[in-house]
Amino acid sequence: MTEPIEVLYFYRTKWGAHDEFMRLFRKNHWPILREQVGEGRFTDVHLATPRFHGDGRADWDIVVSITYRDWASIEEHSEAEIARRLFPDQDAYKAEEQRRFELLDAHWDVPVERRPLE
């Protein structure tokens, strides 16, 4: 399949950890995602958070949508190489990434298929 594939990455941060998670995401993960947009692996990346608390279920508080060029680009694994290039201090980078995931209660990925309404 050669059409773009959208995957939603849901995150639920622990109570009080949202700001720290976002800081670490912007510092360490966003540069890697941005690099992959520049390389053409991704055609779009955006992040969203709920504007309001809603009904209180709080299944997620952050969602990142990544549109991959195609199915083949999902199989490409260039994150580690990009991380080594962008973050020469790998010990600090890995510690901060571990901390970022310690701030989560849950994380899951959902490939979605857009459907025409007419």
Regions found by a protein language model. Give the residues of each.
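Glycine-rich beta-strand-turn "strand-cap" elements at beta-sheet edges
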Residues: 1, 43-60, 85-118
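Active-site-flanking beta-strand signature of metal-NTP-handling nucleotidyl enzymes
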Residues: 4-12, 63-64
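Short amphipathic alpha-helical segments
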Residues: 17-45
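Short amphipathic alpha-helices within nucleic acid-binding modules
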Residues: 19-23, 69-81
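A common structural junction motif
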Residues: 32-33, 82-88
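Aromatic/basic micro-patches that form nucleic-acid/chromatin recognition or nuclease catalytic surfaces
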Residues: 58, 64-69
